[in-house]
Amino acid sequence: MEDLSFRHPVRARADGARRSAIVGIVASGNLEVLVERVLPDAECAIDIKTAAVGFGEVWRAVIGDFVERYSPGGLKFSINDGGARPDTVSLRLAQAVRSIAENGQ
C-alpha cells in the first residue's frame, strides 16, 4: 500500500451545501471516493490509499487536472484505490463533486 496526499489552492468554492458524499466501490480495478465539505473555500485536499505502488506522478497529473477543471474549494477527498485506471479516477472524482453539489445532507 502507498499513501499519497495532495493539497491545492483553488479558484472557487465547490457548489452545493451537502456536507459529504461517497461514490464508487473498492473492487477489482476500481476505487471509492469519500468527499467532505470541511476545508476553507480556497483549499482542496486529496488523500489516497492505493495498492498500486510507484504511480505518484500519474496521481499528481490526474489530481492536478481535476482541480484545474472543477475548482473543488472547501472539499477534502479520501480515496481508497484498488488499482483504478486514470480515466476511472477522473470519472469518480467528477461524480463526487456532482454528488456533493446535490441537495440533501
From Swiss-Prot:
Modified positions (O-(phosphoribosyl dephospho-coenzyme A)serine) in chain numbering: 28
Compartments, as annotated in UniProt: Cytoplasm
Main localization, broad class: cytoplasm
Entry PTM: Covalently binds the prosthetic group of malonate decarboxylase.
A Pfam family recorded for this sequence: ACP
Annotated GO CC locations: cytoplasm
InterPro entries xrefs: Mal_deCO2ase/Cit_lyase_ACP, Malonate_deCO2ase_dsu
UniProt keyword list: Cytoplasm, Phosphoprotein
MF term (GO), any: acyl carrier activity
Highest taxon in the source lineage: Bacteria
Protein role: Subunit of malonate decarboxylase, it is an acyl carrier protein to which acetyl and malonyl thioester residues are bound via a 2'-(5''-phosphoribosyl)-3'-dephospho-CoA prosthetic group and turn over during the catalytic mechanism.
Sequence similarity: Belongs to the MdcC family.
Protein name per the record: Malonate decarboxylase acyl carrier protein
Organism: Bradyrhizobium diazoefficiens (strain JCM 10833 / BCRC 13528 / IAM 13628 / NBRC 14792 / USDA 110)
